[in-house]
Regions:
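PLP-dependent amino-acid enzyme catalytic core
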Residues: 2-410
């Protein structure tokens, strides 16, 4: 790995809109010239890395450290290396031979956010920040609390009151974060925490932070290594749109390095009640129109003004991808199907990606011969209340065999 001095000189921040560049160690979250989003840029033409080097390391986020900005020993809990499951039964039902699910719920805090937080919190330490903060629909707060605890620095999280699954709040509280519940929605919480970080020096670790997204791009790297080839289509639930943006950026870097010769079709799935990105794609809008009151059972993607919409629209359009909505009923049905037909337990938002593929197949919008990777983003136990509401309660019986046989209809 490069020494700290060498590596800091080898990457910088760049505006995705006007191209303005900024030093790697400047703490900014938007372009100072035009206000648009930033991305980390590496001089890939001079980067000394080989696929064989990666292949000799364990499958994890840090397998790909040459394409990550951290120069200190990372704050890590061995995140990444999540399983890629072949969905044989569901694929057969849909007429798809090559349908896969990348189960990000198997990360340390139970969601894909850990990939971003291992890098983001490591960067906070590297940059000398003493505290970190985020707004969250749940998973970001849980992950930030976990990694801040590992780093030994305070964390502040803002949540929309009454709109975060109990499992996620429990994680943030148990790991010692200062949890603030606001009477408002996620977008308002994000605006507040952004202002807090700018005015009081906390390090913001929402997906507006370009360094956090660097960790999340490794989902695509791992899927490529696990499949042995570039998938034809990469499907993700879309909330704040950081994940689809990050994975797309990662694949572009691999293409520029000559490691792959094509990009997957980036496909974003949103809940019908929270779908500004889908609307922008359908209506060919240059940017998303924020939704003031997004609503869906899938709390993790209940976001009306996605921060990374600009990057997400580019990812979908430039790869010939698709964007589609699914109803809450379709999401919950797929959550049950993944559990009962494939043995994969996910939270509602996670099921959106596979539910979206089912819908696209029914619409005749995709080739059934495609090799498709669906990212399922969080674990079943993130939102146990939604699970309990869907299922029949346990059958209570007397403690004797006849009662048991009767309950089992035997």
């Amino acid at each position: 790995m490069y020494s700290a001095g060498q590596k800091i000189l080898m990457y910088h921040l760049a505006c995705v809109n006007c191209g303005a560049t900024f030093p790697a160690d400047e703490i900014i979250y938007n372009c100072k010239k035009c206000g648009h989003l930033l991305a980390v840029r590496y001089p890939l033409d001079t980067l000394s890395v080989k696929r064989e080097t990666w292949n000799n390391r364990p499958l994890s986020v840090w397998r790909y450290k040459e394409l990550l900005p951290v120069t200190i020993p990372p704050i890590t809990l061995q995140e990444g290396g999540t399983p890629l499951y072949h969905l044989e039964r569901l694929g057969k039902e849909m007429g798809l031979k090559h349908l896969y699910a990348k189960h990000e719920g198997m990360n340390p805090s139970g969601s894909f956010k850990d990939r971003g937080m291992t890098v983001g919190v490591s960067m906070a330490v590297q940059l000398g920040k003493k505290s970190v903060a985020c707004a969250s629909t749940g998973n970001t707060s849980a992950s930030l609390a976990v990694y801040a605890a590992k780093a030994g620095i305070p964390a502040v999280v803002l949540l929309p009151a009454g709109k975060v699954a109990v499992g996620k709040i429990a994680q943030a509280l148990m790991h010692g974060a200062k949890v603030i519940s606001i009477r408002g929605n996620f977008d308002q919480a994000l605006e507040m925490v952004h202002e807090l970080c700018l005015s009081h020096g906390l390090y913001l670790l929402n997906s507006i932070n370009p360094y956090r997204l660097e960790g999340q791009k490794t989902i695509g790297f791992e899927a490529l290594d696990q499949l042995g080839d570039v998938p034809d289509r990469f499907v993700l639930p879309v909330g704040n749109a950081g994940n689809i943006s990050a994975v797309y950026k990662g694949f572009m870097e691999l293409e520029e390095l000559g490691f792959i010769d094509r990009l997957p079709m980036m496909t974003g799935i949103q809940a019908q009640g929270s779908s500004p990105v889908v609307r922008a794609i359908r209506e060919n809008l240059p940017e998303v129109i924020p939704e003031k009151n997004p609503e869906t059972i899938a709390t993790a993607i209940r976001i009306g003004a996605p921060v990374n919409a600009e990057k997400a629209l580019s990812a979908i359009r430039k790869t010939g991808g698709l964007a589609e909505t699914v109803t809450d009923d379709e999401i919950l049905q797929m959550q049950r199907d993944l559990a009962r037909k494939e043995g994969i337990g996910v939270e509602p938002a996670s099921a959106a990606s596979v539910a979206g593929i089912r819908k696209l197949v029914q619409m005749g919008a995709i080739d059934r011969n495609e090799r498709i990777v669906c990212v399922v983003t969080g674990h079943l136990l993130k939102d146990p209340d939604t699970v309990i509401k869907q299922c029949e309660p346990p059958i209570e019986i007397n403690a004797d065999l006849p009662s048991l046989l009767s309950a089992l209809h035997l």
